[in-house]
């Protein structure tokens, strides 16, 4: 039962909401007279005038700015509250209790209680308001050309009408028998039916609006598919004339849609796809023009490369449009769902295959269609998508899909041969292929093999290993910390994937680091195998198993620290210079036509560019999978950009070859060159976001010292070329550090931090040119010792400036290079807490200067301060009697005791309780003392566990269920308020934005939770519910539907709160020093949870 919040239909729903409020008012006034009821009726606005004003509320023009909102789905952007949403007001209007929720409680409390008053007057007004709603709905159906809307909307309208009749029947029954229990139940069922029917009505309308946008997108896809068969300039002009207005409509419609979505991820995907389309469209047209010019009147050198560029851009445009179509149809966003997830990849592939099915069937149905046409390519691409699904499906599904792919490919090859030779299709190959395609992709009557594989993969479910090394390390440590917990092998699988990633990283390292990393992996695998063997034999809690667990924990932490260090080194080396290979390639492309080595130089520079791109994309993927970042957004951005760089590299080489032999195609080459350069810079930026800035600066300093040693060797050997290369690398690394410092300063609003970093950056900026100039002087005269000494002095100053930048960014001076930085990161993760300062008063101290402060775990400790003299013994006095201690309330102890009574269930049996446990496991590492965010989040986890009990009918009443959901909403409001307050005081712009984005969804989800809980309360204990046409039906199906939506909403809420806590903990280290905000993040020792 999705609940929507739309401006479009607000005027239609408002009368229904208002009239149901008056029904409630009359239900609560047992002594109300008929005159008072009539008085209430006369105070209402004129419903007929209201209906006429709302008659066109469902028009396309108005609805485009008022897309509805779902319970679990993507929603309009504004935060939902009780005052703005008429549907919410049906459940939770202004006042102590909501309309339907209050009726539920009245029904529950009225066993043999007070009599109900005469409700025929207000119920009659409800009927008239519902009648206006139904009239507008039917008018919308009559004027729409959407057959699905015309099919789905009438049952929803009939359901609302049937529920309204139930209200009328209940009011007449209560008029004759004020104590009638069945009449009271009809009253509740009628109100609930109106709500559910109205929600179904709005769902139909919103899906119709989405289909309108999708139709425009598919029309654009049809035009793009034609681009591969255009062979004349006249056809190209007509193509541009036809596709331009379609792309304009797509841009406008998608832009209006994304503005009203609440999910930041969905908005960003739509914006990114539209930006890509705006960039690709002119490049596609230019590549089409180039391919036509090089192919007319006969193909010239570079024609094949131009066609490859055109086809690539056409495919890119199609993929971006398919991604828009996919996101437009999304109704939920699961924060735990990664783009590399098998289910997500399968869903994308199925959506893309369905979009190609019509073109494929049209080609098969046309006996005169040529081989190589758009339809045949559609069949080939469907097979590619099917193969992608089979690679991720269950074994039995994969086998069926592969068999179908083989049959379709064989039939298509035979059919192409027949048509190329002009022979008829006597064996009905086209019909057989069409039937196989429908069986594979699905049709109106069947889900198809690909759809079945997707459903089975979703049903197989279970938790998947994390997608980053940090996440897998966390899963493995959680498995080791909970020996009695059956995680289905998740922890062991995460551990093995972690070591597999480490071995991939080892291939990129020098022999010394490679051997150490491989040795760590071998030790971990050996210990894991021993532990798994002990658990299989039932000895998982033996002393030997505990000893192995401790060894594994230490080895895993060492592995994580070592991977982070060597990965940062790889980023420093591979991304130090991203422009030189590209610059040299461009120079090779523009070489003099009469240069005899022109072709060979182009091949060499192309190979160097390809190798450099492969090195960067490989390192970037390792950063995404093995790096310290847990941010889904950052990791996905790295993977997406790395794939684009990898795809664009051969296209840039093709465009360069075209330009090499055809100087007139300069614009075509510049278009792809610019796109490739932009992708490179984006990739470097995303990689920089994924690694620690302080670690990067320290690693850069170490690399610069290594190149300094190479320069010393070049000076001693009078190697001018080696000196120039190594000193240039030092300068490049210095510029990288300078760019990083400038980014850090731009991202902060803390005046002292910005000033400190900018001063260090200015010092570094001034130190680079002297070092480079002195290196040039040595290169001109390698035996000039005076110039060598000058170079050493300027280079030392440069290295000191780099260290000063690292000190300014981290806030901690490093005396021993980068080693201290890693020691600091280790100490931050340790549970050690320094003892509180002594309460004794220091009366006298011998005069001695204090020593330099010692840096330890970000605390400054002064040593060698003599202890104060021992005070005299106290005089014996008779102290007054000690008052009795006040009763203490230990919230942490109460929380621990609560979760001991609620053990972790199987997620498939009690998913709401499992979601509450998931949040609790995230929060139990933090103390709630002096941290209101953690305290409120812990209350939410406990309340959600209680709500799980209530919705399963395990004790409590309907009133308890409704009140519990309201308490959860109140706690979520507190979490959001505190998170927004913290975000306003955060000086880090990126952290502040991330915190605001993850917290903006909580109020909407919490409001929806109250609505769903009320709907669930109306179904508890009910044998029957109201069917689509007002008839009573068995309630199992609708009750299951309501329960599933409530479960999904609860899971989203718990996940959102967990994300807010993580973002708040990260943002807390960057709050304004003069804010006065007190928010302690005190990590609890593990033993305190037992």
Swiss-Prot record:
Supply one GO BP term.
cell adhesion
Segments annotated as sequence repeats: 339-446, 455-561
| Matches recorded under InterPro entries | Alpha-catenin/vinculin-like_sf, Vinculin, Vinculin/catenin, Vinculin_CS
Q: Pro residues bias: where? A: 866-887
What's in the GO CC field?
actin cytoskeleton; adherens junction; cell-cell contact zone; cytoplasm; cytoskeleton; dense body; focal adhesion; plasma membrane
Keywords from UniProt, A to Z, are: Actin-binding, Cell adhesion, Cell junction, Cell membrane, Cytoplasm, Cytoskeleton, Membrane, Repeat
Q: Where is this region: Disordered?
A: 811-842, 864-895
List the subcellular locations.
Cytoplasm, Cytoskeleton; Cell junction, Adherens junction; Cell membrane; Cell junction
Where does it mainly reside?
cytoplasm
Q: In what tissue types does this protein appear?
A: Expressed in gonadal sheath cells and the spermatheca. Expressed in body wall muscles.
Q: What happens when the gene is disrupted?
A: RNAi-mediated knockdown causes an accumulation in the proximal gonad of endomitotic mature oocytes in 30 percent of animals. RNAi-mediated knockdown disrupts the assembly of actin into myofibrils, and furthermore reduces the co-localization of ketn-1 and actin in early embryos.
Note the topology in the membrane: Peripheral membrane protein
Q: Which PROSITE patterns match?
A: VINCULIN_1, VINCULIN_2
Domain of life of the native organism: Eukaryota
Q: Which residues form a coiled coil?
A: none
* Gene3D superfamilies according to UniProt: Alpha-catenin/vinculin-like, Vinculin, Vh2 four-helix bundle
Tell me the subunit arrangement: May interact with sorb-1.
What the protein does? Involved in cell adhesion. May be involved in the attachment of the actin-based microfilaments to the plasma membrane. Involved in ovulation.
* Name of the protein described by the UniProt record: Vinculin
Q: Which organism is it from?
A: Caenorhabditis elegans
Q: What is the lineage of its organism?
A: Eukaryota, Metazoa, Ecdysozoa, Nematoda, Chromadorea
Q: Which gene encodes it?
A: deb-1
């Amino acid at each position: 039962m999705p609940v929507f919040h739309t401006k479009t239909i607000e005027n239609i729903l408002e009368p229904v909401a208002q009239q149901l409020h008056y029904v409630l008012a009359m239900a609560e006034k047992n002594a109300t007279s008929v005159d008072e009821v009539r008085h209430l009726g006369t105070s209402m606005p004129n419903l007929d005038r209201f209906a006429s004003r709302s008659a066109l509320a469902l028009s396309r023009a108005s609805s485009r700015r008022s897309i509805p909102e779902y319970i679990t789905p993507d929603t309009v952007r504004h935060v939902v509250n009780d005052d703005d949403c008429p549907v919410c007001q049906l459940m939770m209007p202004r006042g102590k209790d909501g309309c339907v929720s209050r009726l539920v409680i009245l029904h529950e409390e009225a066993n043999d209680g007070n009599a109900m008053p005469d409700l025929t007057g207000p119920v009659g007004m409800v009927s008239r308001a519902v009648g206006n709603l139904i009239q507008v709905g039917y008018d919308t159906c009559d004027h729409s050309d959407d057959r699905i809307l015309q099919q789905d909307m009438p049952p929803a309208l009939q359901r609302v009408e049937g529920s309204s009749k139930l209200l009328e029947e209940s009011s007449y029954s209560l008029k004759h028998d004020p104590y009638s229990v069945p009449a009271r139940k009809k009253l509740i069922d009628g109100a609930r039916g109106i709500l559910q029917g109205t929600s179904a009505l709005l769902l139909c309308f919103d899906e119709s609006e989405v289909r309108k946008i999708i139709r425009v997108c598919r029309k654009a896809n049809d035009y793009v598919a034609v681009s591969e068969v255009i062979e004349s300039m006249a056809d190209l002009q007509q193509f541009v004339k036809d596709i331009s207005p379609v792309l304009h409509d797509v841009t406008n419609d998608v832009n209006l849609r994304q503005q009203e979505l609440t999910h930041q991820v969905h908005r960003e995907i739509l914006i990114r796809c539209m930006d890509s389309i705006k960039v690709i469209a002119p490049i596609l047209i230019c590549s089409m023009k180039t391919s036509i010019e090089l192919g007319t009147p006969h193909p010239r050198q570079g024609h094949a490369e131009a066609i490859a560029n055109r086809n690539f851009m056409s495919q890119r445009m199609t993929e971006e449009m398919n991604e828009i179509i996919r996101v437009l149809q999304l109704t939920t966003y699961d924060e735990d769902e990664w783009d590399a997830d098998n289910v997500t990849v399968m869903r994308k592939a199925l959506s893309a295959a369905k979009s190609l099915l019509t073109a494929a069937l049209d080609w098969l149905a046309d006996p005169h269609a040529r081989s190589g046409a758009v339809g045949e390519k559609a069949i080939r691409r469907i097979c590619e998508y099917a193969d992608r699904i089979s690679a991720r499906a269950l074994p039995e599904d994969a086998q069926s899909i592969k068999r179908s792919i083989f049959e379709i490919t064989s039939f298509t090859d035979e059919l192409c041969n027949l048509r190329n030779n002009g022979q008829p299709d006597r064996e009905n190959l086209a019909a057989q292929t069409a039937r196989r395609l429908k069986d594979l992709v699905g049709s109106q009557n069947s889900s198809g093999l690909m759809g079945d594989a997707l459903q089975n993969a979703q049903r197989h479910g279970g938790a998947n290993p994390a997608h980053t090394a940090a996440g897998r390390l966390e899963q493995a440590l959680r498995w080791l910390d909970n020996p009695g917990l059956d995680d289905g092998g998740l922890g062991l699988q995460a551990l093995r994937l972690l070591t597999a990633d480490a071995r991939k990283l080892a291939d990129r390292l020098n022999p010394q680091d490679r051997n150490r990393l491989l040795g760590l992996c071998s030790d971990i695998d050996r210990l894991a195998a021993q532990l798994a063997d002990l658990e299989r034999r039932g000895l998982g809690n033996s002393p030997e198993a505990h000893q192995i667990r401790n060894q594994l924990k230490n080895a895993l932490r060492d592995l994580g620290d070592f991977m982070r260090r060597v990965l940062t080194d790889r980023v420093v080396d591979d991304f130090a210079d991203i422009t030189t290979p590209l610059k040299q390639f461009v120079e090779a492309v523009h070489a003099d036509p009469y240069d005899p080595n022109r072709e060979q130089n182009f091949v060499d520079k192309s190979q160097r560019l390809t190798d450099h791109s492969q090195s960067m994309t490989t390192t970037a993927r390792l950063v995404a999978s093995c790096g310290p970042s847990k941010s889904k957004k950052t990791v996905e951005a790295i993977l997406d950009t790395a794939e684009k760089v990898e795809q664009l590299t051969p296209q840039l080489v093709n465009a360069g070859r075209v330009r090499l032999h055809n100087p007139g195609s300069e614009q075509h080459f510049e278009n792809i060159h610019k796109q490739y350069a932009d992708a490179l810079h984006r990739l470097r930026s995303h990689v920089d976001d994924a690694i620690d800035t302080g670690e990067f600066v320290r690693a850069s300093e170490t690399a610069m010292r290594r190149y300094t040693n190479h320069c010393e060797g070049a000076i001693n050997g009078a190697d001018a070329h080696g000196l120039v290369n190594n000193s240039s690398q030092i300068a490049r690394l210095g510029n990288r550090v300078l760019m990083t410092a400038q980014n850090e300063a731009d991202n902060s609003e803390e005046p002292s931090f910005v000033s400190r970093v900018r001063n260090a950056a200015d010092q570094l900026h001034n130190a680079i040119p002297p070092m480079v100039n002195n290196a040039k002087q040595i290169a001109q005269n390698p035996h000039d010792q005076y110039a060598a000494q000058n170079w050493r002095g300027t280079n030392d100053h440069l290295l000191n400036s780099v260290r000063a930048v690292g000190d300014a960014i981290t806030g901690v001076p490093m005396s021993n290079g980068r080693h201290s930085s890693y020691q600091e990161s280790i100490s931050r993760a340790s549970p050690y807490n320094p003892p509180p300062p002594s309460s004794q008063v220091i009366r006298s101290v011998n005069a001695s200067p204090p020593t330099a402060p010692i840096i330890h775990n970000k605390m400054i400790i002064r040593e060698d301060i003599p202890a104060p003299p021992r005070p005299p013994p106290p005089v014996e006095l008779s102290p007054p009697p000690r008052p009795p201690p006040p009763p203490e309330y230990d919230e942490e102890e109460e929380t621990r005791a609560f979760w001991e009574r609620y053990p972790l269930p199987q997620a498939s049996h009690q998913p709401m309780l499992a979601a509450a446990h998931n949040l609790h496991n995230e929060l139990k590492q933090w103390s709630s003392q002096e941290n209101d965010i953690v305290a409120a989040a812990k209350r939410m986890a406990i309340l959600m566990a209680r709500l799980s009990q209530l919705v399963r009918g395990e004790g409590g009443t309907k009133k308890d269920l409704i009140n519990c959901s309201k308490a959860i909403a109140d706690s979520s409001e507190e979490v959001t308020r505190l998170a927004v307050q913290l975000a306003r005081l955060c000086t880090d712009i990126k952290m502040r934005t991330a915190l605001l984005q993850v917290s903006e969804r909580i109020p909407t989800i919490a409001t929806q939770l109250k609505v769903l809980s009320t709907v669930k309360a109306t179904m508890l204990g009910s044998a029957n519910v109201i069917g689509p046409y007002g008839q009573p039906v068995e309630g199992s199906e609708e009750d299951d539907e309501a329960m599933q939506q409530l479960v999904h909403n609860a899971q989203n809420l718990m996940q959102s709160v967990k994300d807010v806590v993580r973002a708040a903990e990260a943002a807390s280290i960057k709050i304004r020093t003069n804010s006065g905000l007190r928010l302690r993040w005190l990590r609890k020792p593990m033993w305190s949870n037992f």
